[in-house]
């Protein structure tokens, strides 16, 4: 298994640097396989979300669809994929907050607490006042 840095995923998806795009494509479409998978950490997913939205102007829905697409690859394994999939399905809040909440729930946390009013609208998240 090979851990993939966020910039590999960005170059593969965006293809804005021709040389690096070709290298990333060769890795993801040629070298990786079911026996030699790429590993994508939660940190890389969060960075990918941020980069695609802030640097490339992708909408949250396009980012979500893009990450779901990557997750469907049999050549990629995602850290805590269930939490990522659930977090991507939420209609509000940002991905980092949603993954934080889902990861907590998956680790037997009974609630998530925050000072963030928007985040507190999610079921199971409590606004501390």
Model-derived regions: residue spans:
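Active-site-proximal, substrate-binding regions of enzyme catalytic domains
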Residues: 49, 53-69
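Short, well-structured N-terminal submotif of metal-dependent ribonuclease cores
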Residues: 1-40, 55-60, 121-122, 129
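Acidic, PIN/NYN-like endoribonuclease modules and their adjacent C-terminal/linker elements
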Residues: 101-129
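Membrane-interface junctions
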Residues: 34, 90-93
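Conserved glycosyltransferase catalytic-site signature
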Residues: 6, 81, 97-98
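Acidic catalytic patch
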Residues: 41-45, 64-91
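Hydrophobic helix-cap positions at the C-terminus of alpha-helices
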Residues: 30-31, 70, 107
């Amino acid at each position: 298994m090979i851990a993939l840095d966020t910039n590999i995923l960005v170059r593969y998806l965006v293809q804005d640097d021709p040389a690096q795009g070709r290298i990333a494509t060769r890795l993801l479409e040629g070298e990786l396989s079911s026996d030699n998978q790429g590993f994508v950490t939660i940190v890389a997913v969060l960075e990918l979300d941020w980069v695609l939205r802030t640097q490339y102007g992708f909408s949250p829905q396009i980012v979500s669809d893009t990450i779901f697409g990557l997750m469907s690859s049999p050549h990629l394994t995602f850290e805590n994929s269930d939490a990522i999939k659930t977090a991507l399905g939420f209609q509000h809040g940002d991905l980092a907050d949603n993954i934080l909440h889902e990861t907590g729930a998956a680790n037997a946390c009974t609630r998530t607490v925050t000072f963030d009013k928007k985040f507190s609208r999610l079921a199971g998240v409590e606004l501390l006042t």
